[in-house]
Swiss-Prot record:
Cofactor(s) named in the record: Mg(2+); Zn(2+)
Protein family: Belongs to the PRA-CH family.
Keywords: Amino-acid biosynthesis, Cytoplasm, Histidine biosynthesis, Hydrolase, Magnesium, Metal-binding, Zinc
Protein's name according to its UniProt entry: Phosphoribosyl-AMP cyclohydrolase
Organism in which the protein naturally occurs: Neisseria gonorrhoeae (strain ATCC 700825 / FA 1090)
EC nos: 3.5.4.19
Source organism phylogeny: Bacteria, Pseudomonadati, Pseudomonadota, Betaproteobacteria, Neisseriales
Length: 131
């Protein structure tokens, strides 16, 4: 592990840090996930975003199943050291497992959440019928 990379990062009690993926060109927030030290190290080593799945309890590379990888252009750490922003190039234009550009596709509209972004590709086409 790279000591310089990790020493400023404040991982929580579970060994995780919040990671925000933001489109490097449009600046749109595409997704928020979690990283452990291994995922952060792999991200730096490979240049592609890696995360830690809390539900599956394992490290994974974004796009390993879908092909929608995230090429990291820049890493930034916030002033408290507890959140990482990755400026990325999103392969295929789809970051969300629902087949949308962003996981933030719901918009508050006068008392209800409404879907603001269209599905670009159906989940079954991306992952097959087993997902």
């Amino acid at each position: 592990m790279d000591k310089n990379l990790l020493e400023a990062v404040k991982f929580d009690e579970k060994g995780l840090v919040c990671a925000i993926a933001q489109d490097a060109e449009t600046k749109r927030v595409l997704m928020v996930a979690w990283m452990n030290a291994e995922a952060l190290q792999k991200t730096v080593e490979t240049g592609f975003a890696h995360y830690y799945s809390r539900s599956r309890q394992k490290q994974w590379m974004k796009g390993e199943e879908s092909g929608h990888t995230q090429k990291v252009r820049e890493l930034r750490l916030d002033c408290d050291g507890d959140t990482i922003v990755m400026l990325i190039a999103q392969n295929g234009g789809i970051a969300c497992h629902t087949g949308r550009e962003s996981c933030f596709y719901k918009k508050w509209n006068g008392g209800a959440w409404e879907t603001a972004d269209a599905v670009l590709k159906d989940e079954k086409e991306i992952y097959g019928s087993t997902h």
